[in-house]
């Protein structure tokens, strides 16, 4: 049994992950500021601590509890917010991460699992499916901070010997996904279809994404939590894309969901968004 801290564990993916750690017998603490997470998402059996990852008390918690594993899902993940307020994005995604990393280093945490994003760190890659070794060309401050987080993890590994792994998610969907935010097009489209409302597509809808089910993402997290690796020589040695390798256009996704919901397809097209 391991003692596991899941940051962002009241959110969409983090709460499923907290469930999974509990089910396999781990002791789980969920840390979340509830800005986007929901208290009811925290599974029974997990201890809940309401804190922001930038708060000094989050670091104190890590030093006091001596976790075996930290799975870091808390983040500012709205691309549009990162474009309009890059300082805030960096404050959460870099300053918050460093608060945890310094405490983890001092507490000698065994494994740090970091959530990155394959959807933003590569930019518009030429090769698809995109390998982990592809050039990193983020096109938004959010992508920059996610890639920066990976570099910080690699630094702590190289200099301090911290064991870590980075998961570069594609577009995750599934139960508990927020249908009201900027991310989560599957949940957004599904909710609007069931309400009989039109779908808004930004751009021409021919842009493609890789959509992966949250249960598969959880399975990847568990496998990589337990995996052992040789000492890393480069950034991509400890980074893993998590997706299906299948491209789906936004237009095709809208049509598929409309068919599954047995609703008419009514799409309104809007200008493409910056950083998306």
In which residue ranges do the predicted regions lie?
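Hydrophobic aliphatic residues
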Residues: 74, 104, 181, 193-194, ...
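N-terminal Rossmann-like NAD(P)+-binding domain of SDR-like oxidoreductases, especially those catalyzing
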Residues: 1-172
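Residue-level signal for the nucleotide or nucleotide-sugar donor/cofactor binding architecture
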Residues: 84, 92-95, 133, 140, ...
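C-terminal substrate-binding subdomain of Rossmann-fold SDR/epimerase-dehydratase oxidoreductases
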Residues: 52, 194-276
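Hydrophobic alpha-helix immediately C-terminal to the catalytic Tyr-X-X-X-Lys motif of short-chain
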Residues: 148, 152, 156, 189, ...
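Active-site "substrate specificity/gating" loop of NAD(P)-dependent dehydrogenases
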Residues: 124, 136, 141, 178, ...
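Residues in well-ordered alpha-helical elements
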Residues: 68, 80, 87, 98, ...
């Amino acid at each position: 049994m391991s003692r596991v801290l899941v940051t962002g564990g009241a959110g969409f993916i983090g709460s499923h992950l907290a469930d999974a750690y509990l089910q396999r017998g781990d002791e789980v603490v969920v840390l979340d500021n509830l800005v986007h997470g929901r208290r009811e998402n925290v599974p029974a059996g997990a201890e809940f601590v309401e804190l922001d990852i930038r708060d000094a008390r989050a670091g104190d918690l890590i030093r006091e509890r001596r976790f075996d594993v930290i799975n870091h899902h808390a983040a500012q993940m709205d691309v549009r917010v990162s474009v309009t307020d890059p300082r805030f994005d960096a404050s959460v995604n870099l300053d918050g991460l460093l608060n945890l990393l310094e405490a983890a280093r001092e507490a000698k945490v065994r494994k740090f699992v970091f959530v990155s994003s394959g959807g933003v760190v590569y930019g518009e890659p030429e090769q698809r499916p995109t390998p982990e070794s592809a050039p990193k060309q983020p096109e938004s401050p959010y992508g920059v901070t996610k890639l920066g987080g990976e570099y910080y993890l690699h630094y702590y590994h190289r200099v301090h010997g911290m064991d870590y792994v980075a998961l570069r998610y594609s577009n995750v969907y599934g139960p508990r996904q927020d249908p009201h935010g900027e991310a989560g097009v599957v949940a957004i489209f599904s909710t609007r279809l069931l309400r009989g409302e039109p779908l808004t597509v930004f751009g021409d809808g021919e842009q493609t994404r890789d959509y992966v089910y949250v249960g598969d993402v959880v399975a990847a997290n568990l496998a990589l939590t337990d995996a052992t690796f040789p000492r890393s020589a480069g950034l991509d040695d400890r980074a893993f894309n998590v997706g299906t390798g299948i491209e789906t256009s936004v237009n095709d996704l809208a049509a598929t969901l409309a068919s599954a919901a047995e609703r008419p397809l009514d799409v309104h097209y809007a200008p493409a968004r910056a950083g998306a």
